[in-house]
Amino acid sequence: MKKVVSIALALLMVAIMLPVMAMAEDVYTTLPTASNGEISLDKDVVLSAQVTINENVTINFNGHKIYNTATFDGYFILVQKGYTVTMKGGDIVDSRGNEKGTITTVCNHGTLSLENMTISRGVGIAVKNDEDGPTQCGKLTVTNCTITAGSNQIKGQAIQNWGEATIESGTFNADVNAWAYYGGHAGSTTINGGTFNCNVQSLQLNYVSTGWPTTSAQTNINGGTFNGNVATGYQVGDQPSDAVPAPEGDVTSANMGVAGGTFNSDVTEYAGDTLVVENNGTYYVGGTARDAIENATSGTFTVKKAKNDTSLTVKSGVTIVNNSDITITVNDKKVPNGESYTVPGTITIIVPSDGGNTTTTPSTDNTKNPGTGANDFVGVAAAMAVVSLLGAAAVIRKK
Protein backbone atom coordinates (compact mmCIF):
# COMPACT_ATOMS: atom_id res chain seq x y z
CA MET A 1 0.00 0.00 0.00
CA LYS A 2 2.84 2.40 0.86
CA LYS A 3 4.39 1.68 -2.52
CA VAL A 4 1.16 2.59 -4.29
CA VAL A 5 0.88 5.83 -2.32
CA SER A 6 4.50 6.71 -3.14
CA ILE A 7 3.93 6.14 -6.84
CA ALA A 8 0.77 8.27 -6.72
CA LEU A 9 2.61 11.11 -4.98
CA ALA A 10 5.43 10.95 -7.52
CA LEU A 11 2.98 11.11 -10.40
CA LEU A 12 1.25 14.06 -8.72
CA MET A 13 4.54 15.94 -8.40
CA VAL A 14 5.31 15.31 -12.07
CA ALA A 15 1.86 16.59 -13.03
CA ILE A 16 2.40 19.73 -10.96
CA MET A 17 5.86 20.41 -12.36
CA LEU A 18 5.02 19.82 -16.01
CA PRO A 19 3.25 23.20 -16.53
CA VAL A 20 6.12 24.98 -14.76
CA MET A 21 8.70 23.23 -16.93
CA ALA A 22 6.66 23.91 -20.04
CA MET A 23 6.33 27.58 -19.08
CA ALA A 24 10.06 27.84 -18.53
CA GLU A 25 10.74 26.29 -21.91
CA ASP A 26 8.12 28.42 -23.70
CA VAL A 27 9.88 31.76 -23.15
CA TYR A 28 13.33 33.25 -23.58
CA THR A 29 14.92 34.92 -20.57
CA THR A 30 16.90 37.31 -22.77
CA LEU A 31 17.11 38.13 -26.46
CA PRO A 32 18.54 35.29 -28.55
CA THR A 33 21.85 35.78 -30.33
CA ALA A 34 21.60 37.39 -33.76
CA SER A 35 22.25 35.35 -36.89
CA ASN A 36 23.36 37.25 -40.00
CA GLY A 37 22.22 40.51 -38.46
CA GLU A 38 18.75 39.27 -37.51
CA ILE A 39 16.89 37.99 -34.46
CA SER A 40 13.63 36.20 -35.25
CA LEU A 41 11.54 35.46 -32.17
CA ASP A 42 9.54 32.24 -32.06
CA LYS A 43 8.35 32.76 -28.48
CA ASP A 44 8.01 35.51 -25.88
CA VAL A 45 10.89 37.01 -23.91
CA VAL A 46 10.72 37.55 -20.14
CA LEU A 47 13.50 39.87 -19.03
CA SER A 48 15.12 39.81 -15.62
CA ALA A 49 18.07 42.00 -16.70
CA GLN A 50 18.68 44.85 -19.15
CA VAL A 51 19.51 44.01 -22.78
CA THR A 52 22.28 46.21 -24.23
CA ILE A 53 22.57 46.13 -28.02
CA ASN A 54 25.99 46.92 -29.47
CA GLU A 55 25.60 45.53 -32.99
CA ASN A 56 23.58 46.28 -36.12
CA VAL A 57 20.51 44.06 -35.94
CA THR A 58 16.88 43.66 -36.99
CA ILE A 59 14.58 42.11 -34.38
CA ASN A 60 11.52 40.43 -35.90
CA PHE A 61 9.05 39.88 -33.09
CA ASN A 62 6.72 37.77 -35.28
CA GLY A 63 3.78 38.72 -33.04
CA HIS A 64 5.59 37.85 -29.80
CA LYS A 65 6.25 40.15 -26.86
CA ILE A 66 8.93 41.18 -24.41
CA TYR A 67 7.90 41.72 -20.79
CA ASN A 68 9.50 41.90 -17.37
CA THR A 69 9.76 39.95 -14.16
CA ALA A 70 8.54 41.55 -10.94
CA THR A 71 12.09 42.35 -9.80
CA PHE A 72 13.33 43.77 -13.11
CA ASP A 73 15.39 46.98 -12.97
CA GLY A 74 16.93 49.13 -15.72
CA TYR A 75 16.05 49.66 -19.36
CA PHE A 76 14.38 46.83 -21.22
CA ILE A 77 16.54 47.61 -24.24
CA LEU A 78 19.48 50.03 -24.52
CA VAL A 79 20.76 50.75 -28.03
CA GLN A 80 24.31 52.04 -27.84
CA LYS A 81 25.57 54.83 -30.08
CA GLY A 82 27.01 53.89 -33.43
CA TYR A 83 24.63 50.97 -34.02
CA THR A 84 21.51 50.63 -36.16
CA VAL A 85 18.58 48.60 -34.81
CA THR A 86 15.13 47.84 -36.21
CA MET A 87 12.35 46.36 -34.07
CA LYS A 88 9.14 45.30 -35.78
CA GLY A 89 5.96 43.31 -35.48
CA GLY A 90 5.43 42.74 -31.76
CA ASP A 91 4.76 44.03 -28.24
CA ILE A 92 6.88 45.41 -25.44
CA VAL A 93 4.99 45.40 -22.13
CA ASP A 94 6.57 47.11 -19.11
CA SER A 95 4.49 46.71 -15.96
CA ARG A 96 6.62 49.08 -13.88
CA GLY A 97 5.77 52.65 -12.93
CA ASN A 98 6.57 55.34 -10.40
CA GLU A 99 5.21 58.76 -9.50
CA LYS A 100 8.36 60.51 -10.71
CA GLY A 101 7.93 59.05 -14.16
CA THR A 102 11.66 58.36 -14.46
CA ILE A 103 11.56 54.68 -15.43
CA THR A 104 12.32 54.12 -19.12
CA THR A 105 11.51 51.06 -21.23
CA VAL A 106 13.52 51.60 -24.44
CA CYS A 107 16.52 53.96 -24.56
CA ASN A 108 18.23 54.81 -27.83
CA HIS A 109 21.67 56.35 -28.33
CA GLY A 110 22.12 54.93 -31.83
CA THR A 111 19.77 54.70 -34.81
CA LEU A 112 16.48 52.98 -33.96
CA SER A 113 13.49 52.19 -36.17
CA LEU A 114 10.23 51.02 -34.61
CA GLU A 115 7.78 49.46 -37.07
CA ASN A 116 4.34 48.00 -36.28
CA MET A 117 5.14 47.80 -32.58
CA THR A 118 2.92 48.15 -29.51
CA ILE A 119 4.79 49.52 -26.50
CA SER A 120 3.04 50.02 -23.16
CA ARG A 121 4.16 50.78 -19.63
CA GLY A 122 3.12 52.31 -16.32
CA VAL A 123 3.99 55.89 -15.36
CA GLY A 124 7.32 56.76 -16.91
CA ILE A 125 8.91 56.98 -20.36
CA ALA A 126 8.11 54.40 -23.02
CA VAL A 127 10.79 55.45 -25.54
CA LYS A 128 13.68 57.81 -24.74
CA ASN A 129 15.67 59.05 -27.72
CA ASP A 130 18.76 60.19 -25.86
CA GLU A 131 21.88 62.24 -26.52
CA ASP A 132 25.56 62.20 -25.63
CA GLY A 133 26.39 65.89 -25.72
CA PRO A 134 25.68 68.72 -28.14
CA THR A 135 26.90 66.91 -31.29
CA GLN A 136 25.98 63.26 -30.67
CA CYS A 137 22.40 62.09 -30.40
CA GLY A 138 20.07 59.20 -31.02
CA LYS A 139 18.07 59.01 -34.25
CA LEU A 140 14.58 57.53 -33.99
CA THR A 141 11.95 56.66 -36.61
CA VAL A 142 8.46 55.45 -35.63
CA THR A 143 6.05 53.92 -38.15
CA ASN A 144 2.59 52.51 -37.39
CA CYS A 145 3.20 51.98 -33.68
CA THR A 146 0.92 52.28 -30.65
CA ILE A 147 2.76 53.69 -27.64
CA THR A 148 1.18 54.14 -24.21
CA ALA A 149 2.62 55.32 -20.89
CA GLY A 150 0.99 56.24 -17.59
CA SER A 151 -2.45 55.83 -16.11
CA ASN A 152 -5.74 57.68 -16.13
CA GLN A 153 -4.46 59.81 -13.24
CA ILE A 154 -0.83 60.39 -14.28
CA LYS A 155 0.30 60.49 -17.88
CA GLY A 156 3.80 59.56 -18.86
CA GLN A 157 5.76 60.21 -22.03
CA ALA A 158 5.30 58.05 -25.09
CA ILE A 159 8.43 59.62 -26.57
CA GLN A 160 10.98 61.75 -24.73
CA ASN A 161 13.23 63.15 -27.43
CA TRP A 162 16.64 64.70 -26.83
CA GLY A 163 17.92 63.73 -30.27
CA GLU A 164 16.38 63.56 -33.73
CA ALA A 165 13.02 61.80 -34.08
CA THR A 166 10.65 61.28 -37.00
CA ILE A 167 7.12 59.99 -36.50
CA GLU A 168 5.46 58.74 -39.66
CA SER A 169 2.28 57.20 -38.23
CA GLY A 170 0.76 55.48 -35.22
CA THR A 171 -1.28 56.13 -32.07
CA PHE A 172 0.30 57.84 -29.07
CA ASN A 173 -1.52 57.70 -25.73
CA ALA A 174 1.02 59.72 -23.74
CA ASP A 175 2.98 62.93 -24.29
CA VAL A 176 5.40 63.32 -27.19
CA ASN A 177 8.00 65.90 -26.10
CA ALA A 178 11.15 67.39 -27.60
CA TRP A 179 13.54 68.69 -24.93
CA ALA A 180 16.55 70.99 -24.69
CA TYR A 181 18.85 71.67 -21.72
CA TYR A 182 22.01 73.69 -21.22
CA GLY A 183 25.06 72.01 -22.72
CA GLY A 184 23.14 69.20 -24.40
CA HIS A 185 21.74 68.43 -27.82
CA ALA A 186 18.38 70.12 -28.46
CA GLY A 187 15.72 67.59 -29.37
CA SER A 188 14.09 67.91 -32.79
CA THR A 189 10.88 66.01 -33.62
CA THR A 190 9.23 65.81 -37.05
CA ILE A 191 5.66 64.50 -37.17
CA ASN A 192 4.24 63.50 -40.56
CA GLY A 193 1.15 61.66 -39.34
CA GLY A 194 -0.51 59.73 -36.53
CA THR A 195 -3.09 60.19 -33.78
CA PHE A 196 -1.88 61.93 -30.61
CA ASN A 197 -4.20 61.60 -27.63
CA CYS A 198 -2.03 63.57 -25.19
CA ASN A 199 0.20 66.63 -25.46
CA VAL A 200 2.82 67.35 -28.11
CA GLN A 201 5.36 69.86 -26.81
CA SER A 202 8.73 71.53 -27.32
CA LEU A 203 10.23 72.20 -23.88
CA GLN A 204 13.17 74.19 -22.53
CA LEU A 205 14.52 72.64 -19.33
CA ASN A 206 16.43 74.43 -16.58
CA TYR A 207 18.02 71.99 -14.17
CA VAL A 208 18.44 75.07 -11.88
CA SER A 209 22.12 74.36 -11.33
CA THR A 210 22.95 74.79 -15.03
CA GLY A 211 20.55 77.50 -16.21
CA TRP A 212 18.41 77.75 -19.32
CA PRO A 213 19.50 76.15 -22.61
CA THR A 214 20.90 78.32 -25.37
CA THR A 215 19.52 76.10 -28.14
CA SER A 216 15.84 75.45 -28.92
CA ALA A 217 13.84 72.25 -28.68
CA GLN A 218 12.00 71.96 -32.00
CA THR A 219 8.84 70.21 -33.21
CA ASN A 220 7.67 70.32 -36.83
CA ILE A 221 4.17 69.02 -37.56
CA ASN A 222 3.24 68.23 -41.15
CA GLY A 223 0.13 66.16 -40.52
CA GLY A 224 -1.83 64.04 -38.06
CA THR A 225 -4.69 64.31 -35.57
CA PHE A 226 -3.91 66.02 -32.26
CA ASN A 227 -6.40 65.59 -29.40
CA GLY A 228 -4.27 67.18 -26.67
CA ASN A 229 -2.44 70.48 -26.40
CA VAL A 230 0.23 71.43 -28.91
CA ALA A 231 2.54 74.04 -27.38
CA THR A 232 5.98 75.23 -26.36
CA GLY A 233 6.94 75.69 -22.74
CA TYR A 234 9.50 75.98 -19.96
CA GLN A 235 10.27 73.42 -17.24
CA VAL A 236 12.38 73.68 -14.09
CA GLY A 237 13.99 71.00 -11.94
CA ASP A 238 14.96 67.36 -12.21
CA GLN A 239 12.42 64.77 -13.27
CA PRO A 240 9.64 65.25 -12.71
CA SER A 241 10.18 68.87 -13.71
CA ASP A 242 7.58 71.57 -13.19
CA ALA A 243 6.06 73.86 -15.81
CA VAL A 244 6.81 77.56 -15.25
CA PRO A 245 5.87 80.79 -17.06
CA ALA A 246 8.24 82.22 -19.64
CA PRO A 247 11.24 83.55 -17.67
CA GLU A 248 12.23 87.18 -17.83
CA GLY A 249 15.32 88.33 -19.64
CA ASP A 250 17.13 87.03 -22.69
CA VAL A 251 16.15 83.36 -22.62
CA THR A 252 16.05 81.11 -25.67
CA SER A 253 12.56 79.79 -26.36
CA ALA A 254 11.47 76.45 -27.80
CA ASN A 255 10.08 76.26 -31.33
CA MET A 256 6.93 74.73 -32.77
CA GLY A 257 6.07 74.72 -36.48
CA VAL A 258 2.70 73.54 -37.79
CA ALA A 259 2.21 73.02 -41.53
CA GLY A 260 -0.67 70.53 -41.56
CA GLY A 261 -3.04 68.45 -39.44
CA THR A 262 -6.21 68.51 -37.33
CA PHE A 263 -6.06 69.99 -33.82
CA ASN A 264 -8.22 70.36 -30.71
CA SER A 265 -6.18 73.38 -29.58
CA ASP A 266 -5.51 76.71 -31.29
CA VAL A 267 -2.20 76.39 -33.14
CA THR A 268 -2.51 79.59 -35.19
CA GLU A 269 0.59 81.15 -33.61
CA TYR A 270 2.72 78.21 -34.78
CA ALA A 271 1.45 78.08 -38.37
CA GLY A 272 3.39 80.95 -39.96
CA ASP A 273 1.45 82.02 -43.06
CA THR A 274 -0.04 78.55 -43.59
CA LEU A 275 -3.83 78.35 -43.99
CA VAL A 276 -5.63 77.81 -40.65
CA VAL A 277 -9.40 77.41 -40.34
CA GLU A 278 -11.60 76.69 -37.32
CA ASN A 279 -14.93 74.88 -37.17
CA ASN A 280 -16.70 74.16 -33.86
CA GLY A 281 -13.46 74.24 -31.86
CA THR A 282 -11.46 72.09 -34.26
CA TYR A 283 -8.53 73.68 -36.09
CA TYR A 284 -7.40 72.54 -39.52
CA VAL A 285 -4.04 73.53 -40.98
CA GLY A 286 -2.51 73.52 -44.45
CA GLY A 287 -3.80 70.98 -46.94
CA THR A 288 -6.01 69.52 -44.21
CA ALA A 289 -7.70 72.93 -43.85
CA ARG A 290 -8.34 73.23 -47.57
CA ASP A 291 -9.74 69.69 -47.72
CA ALA A 292 -12.03 70.36 -44.73
CA ILE A 293 -13.47 73.51 -46.34
CA GLU A 294 -13.80 72.26 -49.88
CA ASN A 295 -15.39 68.93 -48.88
CA ALA A 296 -17.89 70.47 -46.43
CA THR A 297 -21.57 70.66 -47.42
CA SER A 298 -22.65 72.87 -44.51
CA GLY A 299 -21.32 74.72 -41.48
CA THR A 300 -19.31 77.83 -40.68
CA PHE A 301 -15.53 77.91 -41.10
CA THR A 302 -13.46 80.77 -39.72
CA VAL A 303 -10.24 81.51 -41.58
CA LYS A 304 -7.70 82.38 -38.87
CA LYS A 305 -4.64 82.73 -41.07
CA ALA A 306 -3.99 82.75 -44.82
CA LYS A 307 -1.61 83.96 -47.50
CA ASN A 308 -2.40 87.03 -49.61
CA ASP A 309 -3.34 85.00 -52.68
CA THR A 310 -5.52 82.43 -50.89
CA SER A 311 -8.47 81.30 -53.03
CA LEU A 312 -11.03 78.74 -51.85
CA THR A 313 -13.66 76.75 -53.74
CA VAL A 314 -16.59 76.02 -51.45
CA LYS A 315 -19.89 74.17 -51.85
CA SER A 316 -23.25 75.91 -51.53
CA GLY A 317 -24.57 76.33 -47.99
CA VAL A 318 -21.12 76.77 -46.43
CA THR A 319 -20.27 80.04 -44.64
CA ILE A 320 -16.73 81.41 -44.61
CA VAL A 321 -15.81 83.98 -41.93
CA ASN A 322 -12.58 85.80 -42.72
CA ASN A 323 -10.54 86.73 -39.63
CA SER A 324 -7.15 86.36 -41.31
CA ASP A 325 -6.26 90.10 -41.50
CA ILE A 326 -6.11 89.89 -45.31
CA THR A 327 -8.62 89.65 -48.17
CA ILE A 328 -9.28 86.14 -49.44
CA THR A 329 -11.24 84.84 -52.42
CA VAL A 330 -14.14 82.42 -52.07
CA ASN A 331 -15.64 81.07 -55.30
CA ASP A 332 -14.21 84.09 -57.19
CA LYS A 333 -15.75 86.52 -54.68
CA LYS A 334 -13.45 88.81 -52.68
CA VAL A 335 -14.06 88.53 -48.93
CA PRO A 336 -12.25 91.26 -46.92
CA ASN A 337 -10.99 90.72 -43.40
CA GLY A 338 -13.79 90.86 -40.83
CA GLU A 339 -16.51 89.89 -43.30
CA SER A 340 -18.27 86.62 -44.06
CA TYR A 341 -19.72 85.01 -47.14
CA THR A 342 -22.26 82.22 -47.47
CA VAL A 343 -22.11 80.41 -50.78
CA PRO A 344 -25.65 80.54 -52.22
CA GLY A 345 -27.67 77.53 -53.21
CA THR A 346 -28.81 76.68 -56.73
CA ILE A 347 -31.99 77.41 -58.70
CA THR A 348 -33.21 74.53 -60.83
CA ILE A 349 -35.25 75.29 -63.96
CA ILE A 350 -37.17 72.31 -65.37
CA VAL A 351 -37.90 72.57 -69.11
CA PRO A 352 -40.16 69.93 -70.73
CA SER A 353 -38.73 68.41 -73.90
CA ASP A 354 -40.57 67.16 -76.96
CA GLY A 355 -40.59 63.61 -75.65
CA GLY A 356 -42.13 64.58 -72.33
CA ASN A 357 -38.83 64.21 -70.43
CA THR A 358 -37.29 67.13 -68.63
CA THR A 359 -33.91 68.79 -68.70
CA THR A 360 -32.44 70.53 -65.66
CA THR A 361 -30.58 73.81 -65.88
CA PRO A 362 -28.86 74.82 -62.60
CA SER A 363 -28.06 78.43 -61.83
CA THR A 364 -26.65 80.18 -58.75
CA ASP A 365 -28.52 82.98 -56.98
CA ASN A 366 -25.76 85.49 -57.59
CA THR A 367 -25.53 84.93 -61.37
CA LYS A 368 -25.60 88.24 -63.23
CA ASN A 369 -27.40 89.09 -66.46
CA PRO A 370 -24.43 89.40 -68.85
CA GLY A 371 -25.97 92.41 -70.63
CA THR A 372 -27.05 94.49 -67.64
CA GLY A 373 -25.17 93.07 -64.67
CA ALA A 374 -28.52 92.79 -62.88
CA ASN A 375 -29.51 89.83 -60.73
CA ASP A 376 -31.20 86.94 -62.50
CA PHE A 377 -34.74 87.71 -61.35
CA VAL A 378 -35.43 88.96 -64.90
CA GLY A 379 -33.89 85.79 -66.32
CA VAL A 380 -35.95 83.61 -64.00
CA ALA A 381 -39.15 85.40 -65.06
CA ALA A 382 -38.24 84.95 -68.70
CA ALA A 383 -37.48 81.29 -68.14
CA MET A 384 -40.86 80.82 -66.44
CA ALA A 385 -42.54 82.45 -69.44
CA VAL A 386 -40.69 80.08 -71.76
CA VAL A 387 -41.79 77.13 -69.65
CA SER A 388 -45.41 78.31 -69.90
CA LEU A 389 -45.22 78.70 -73.69
CA LEU A 390 -43.55 75.31 -74.12
CA GLY A 391 -46.16 73.73 -71.91
CA ALA A 392 -48.94 75.31 -73.99
CA ALA A 393 -47.29 74.14 -77.20
CA ALA A 394 -47.07 70.64 -75.85
CA VAL A 395 -50.79 70.66 -74.99
CA ILE A 396 -51.69 71.92 -78.49
CA ARG A 397 -49.61 69.15 -80.11
CA LYS A 398 -51.26 66.51 -77.94
CA LYS A 399 -54.67 67.67 -79.12
What is the role of each PLM region?
Residues 46-58, 66-88, 94-112, 123-135, ...:
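Extracellular beta-strand-rich solenoid/capping regions of secreted or surface-exposed proteins
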